Regions:
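PLP-dependent class I/II
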Residues: 1-10, 14-15, 26-30, 34, ...
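Glycine-centered secondary-structure boundary/capping sites
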Residues: 60, 83-86
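Short, well-ordered amphipathic alpha-helices
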Residues: 75-81
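A glycine-/small-polar-enriched, mobile loop at the entrance of the PLP active site in fold-type I
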Residues: 34-42, 55-75
Length: 371
């Protein structure tokens, strides 16, 4: 009798399934949860974007597109990137979501044994992705305020360091890096000849300052962006990546043998999305941020987030996992911080939810904090 379990590759056994998915599975079993666990907007895709997709389907634009993306979308993105950065060697292509862009970037750059610097806490995908390609994740602790200490970064750089993974505004912390942090990191990467990948999927959700990108200070920065968060298109799988042409051409080559292309109808929708004004949605999320912060500031210790749609407070006692267990007993869904970190002291709370849900969540959280 054959044993299918013996067929599983070692690389796929070095990490577990996403803990976030486990929480989502649990949510499906609760009748009416107060759900502050979701990492996607609670508004819908704009109507004009939906209509552009429908029209593309009806017009028969349903086949493969070029791997680098449909010409009109790629040209528009390239024009915007050129105007913004004025780099001679910055090229753009359309990826199958920002996650697809992350996969292709790491596949293009990281050899087995290469070290990749990741700031802790981190987006849940980063560490497993580096492990999947045989790289070595090197975590840089940013607790308690989740700011980048360049001395810490420099202290872990070795002759094996290949890549720095940077995310601002960050998931799970919501922290938007300052100009000084971004500029310093960009310069350090340039001085050390280390690739720098900037995950900017939340760049449209910055509330108190502006979104700073290391590409302004290091022309070899690779930038990942997309429509998933800004236009609530998480299920449409359209992102884009821009960076040095040699890297981008390698990623396009790998896309030909993996994702092939982003879904063509969704690319036409993405083209329409570029012309949709989204500032009201962003203002609404700033208000939701303030609602959550005001509700929890007397009972929890946290650094106020400047972007994205997450709060990452320290739990009053015990571990983050224990606190989440107690929250679930009250029908509240939040995410334990250990999913995003080597530490189990915090929880991630999403305010991408209706105001009434946020208010219910605040009351439950305050009750748990006060015992």
């Amino acid at each position: 009798m054959s044993d299918p379990a013996s067929w599983i590759s070692e690389r796929s056994q070095c990490f577990d399934s996403s803990g976030i998915r486990k929480v989502f599975d649990l949510a499906a079993k609760l009748e009416n949860p107060v759900n502050l666990s979701i990492g996607q907007p609670d508004f819908d895709v704009p109507d004009s974007v939906k209509q552009a997709c429908v029209e593309a389907i009806q017009q028969g634009k349903n086949a493969y597109s070029p791997s680098q993306g449909i010409g009109s979308l790629r040209s528009e993105l390239q024009a915007r990137v050129d105007k913004r950065f004025e780099h001679e060697d910055r090229e753009v292509f359309v990826s199958s979501g920002t996650s697809g862009g992350l996969v292709l970037t790491v596949l293009s750059l990281v050899n087995p044994g290469d070290e990749v610097i990741i700031f802790d806490p981190y987006f849940v995908m980063y560490v497993p992705l580096v492990q999947l390609v045989g790289g070595v994740p090197v975590l840089v602790d940013t607790y308690p305020d989740f700011r980048i200490d360049l001395d810490k970064v420099e202290s872990v750089i070795t002759d094996k360091t290949k890549l720095i993974l940077f995310n601002s505004p960050g998931n799970p912390t919501g922290i938007a890096a300052s100009k000084e942090e971004v500029q310093g990191l960009a310069q350090l990467a340039a001085d050390k000849n280390i690739a720098l990948l900037s995950d900017e999927i939340y760049s449209q959700f910055v509330y108190d300052d502006q979104a700073y990108t290391p590409a302004d200070y290091n022309p070899n920065t690779i930038v990942i962006d997309g429509f998933s968060k800004s236009h609530a298109m998480t299920g449409w799988r359209v992102g884009w990546v821009h960076g040095p042409s040699e890297v981008i051409q390698t990623m396009i080559k790998l896309q030909q043998y993996s994702f092939v292309c982003a879904p063509q109808p969704a690319q036409w929708a993405g083209l329409a999305a570029l012309d949709v004004e989204m500032t009201q949605y962003q203002a609404d999320y700033r208000r939701k941020r303030d609602l959550l912060v005001e509700g929890l500031k007397d009972d929890f210790e946290f650094t106020e987030p400047g972007g994205a749609f997450y709060l990452f407070p320290k739990v009053p006692s015990g571990t983050g996992t224990e606190f989440v267990t107690k929250a679930i007993e009250k029908d509240l869904l939040i995410i334990p911080g250990s999913i995003f970190s080597s530490q189990d002291t915090h929880v991630r709370i999403s305010y991408a939810a209706p105001d009434a849900t946020i208010e219910k969540g605040v009351e439950i959280l305050k009750g748990l904090a006060r015992g």
